[in-house]
């Protein structure tokens, strides 16, 4: 039945209550303790729609029968609060949220839609990791940081709009988002972690922000269908493994701000047939083009440049830039 006067649910209060299928309406609840409903695997109906509660860590972890949640008035969600809720399909709203714990919805593999997210400045680490069906999520324009692996292996995510309030995208944030078609990083972003878009194999075009001065390691590795990459304006080096496994990339022009091409930067770019290397480049790692088809690859170089000398020494076909 309903629980009209209940205000507080203790830590582990219903933990492993394997026969619990319904928790009645509790409109006055303000706090749900840590592990309160952990592994209530038959719990389908939760009478907390619209309540202004704080939800503790792992409060609903592995509640594998929940399908929809309205968290529109919830202000705080703890770490792993809803992780491993494998049948959860919809989170109607997170519009009042001011504190969201890391891994909060990790491995909610049926989760398709997340409603409006409140005015967070940071999206926590691994918050939607392995949400393999996630297709609809909108980030607020207060967002400044997208945390480590926040969307890692969200295989179904077809697009993401990164607000121009974001300045930092941490490592692996979108790694393995295999349905993303185009990736445009706003110019507000000045810091990006390694492998940030690695394995986004369906993306055909990737645009990095103008003011980034470096390329993160393995940044777009295994973006199998990428045919166009737009460099930052002041980038100084092509980092380790950055284009590794970009097997559809045919031509690329390296900006004249670049001085270094690092370890295996273009490893296994097997379709690469033409690369323009400016006179600004003064160092190319001996492994930078490992796995490329040397007999089909033409370097476009400046007469007397380091790139020309390197091409001659290593038996690459080269022509002079016009």
Where would I find each of the regions flagged by the language model?
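Structural signature of tandem-repeat unit edges
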Residues: 1-8, 18-31, 41-54, 64-76, ...
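Consensus positions within tandem repeat domains that build extended binding/scaffold surfaces
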Residues: 10-15, 33-38, 56-59, 78-81, ...
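Short, structured coil segments at secondary-structure junctions
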Residues: 313-315
């Amino acid at each position: 039945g309903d629980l009209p006067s209940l205000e507080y649910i203790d830590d582990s209060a219903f933990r492993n209550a394997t026969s619990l299928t319904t928790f009645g309406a509790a409109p006055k609840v303000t706090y749900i303790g840590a592990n309160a409903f952990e592994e209530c695997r038959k719990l389908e109906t939760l009478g907390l729609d619209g309540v202004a509660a704080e939800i503790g860590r792992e409060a609903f972890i592995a509640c594998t029968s929940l399908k929809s949640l309205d968290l529109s008035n919830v202000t705080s969600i703890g770490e792993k609060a809803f992780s491993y809720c494998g049948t959860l399909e919809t989170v109607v709203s997170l519009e009042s949220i001011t504190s969201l714990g890391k891994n909060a919805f990790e491995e909610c593999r049926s989760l398709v839609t997340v409603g409006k997210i409140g005015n967070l400045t940071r999206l926590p680490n691994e918050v939607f990791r392995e949400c393999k069906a996630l297709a609809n999520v909108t980030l607020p324009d207060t967002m400044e940081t997208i945390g480590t692996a926040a969307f890692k292996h969200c295989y179904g995510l077809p697009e993401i709009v990164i607000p121009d309030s974001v300045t930092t995208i941490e490592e692996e944030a979108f790694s393995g988002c295999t349905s993303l078609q185009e990736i445009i990083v706003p110019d507000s972003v000045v810091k990006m972690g390694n492998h940030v878009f690695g394995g986004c194999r369906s993306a055909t075009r990737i645009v990095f922000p103008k003011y980034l001065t470096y390329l993160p390691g393995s940044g777009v590795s295994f973006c199998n269908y990428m045919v166009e990459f737009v460099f930052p304006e002041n980038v100084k080096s092509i980092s380790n493994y950055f284009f590794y496994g970009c097997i559809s990339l045919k031509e690329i022009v390296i900006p004249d701000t670049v001085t270094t091409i690092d370890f295996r930067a273009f490893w296994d770019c097997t379709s690469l047939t033409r690369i323009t290397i400016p006179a600004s480049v003064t160092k190319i790692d001996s492994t930078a083009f490992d796995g490329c088809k040397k007999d089909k690859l033409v370097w476009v170089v400046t007469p007397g440049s380091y790139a020309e000398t390197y091409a001659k020494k290593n038996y690459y076909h080269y022509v002079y830039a016009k």
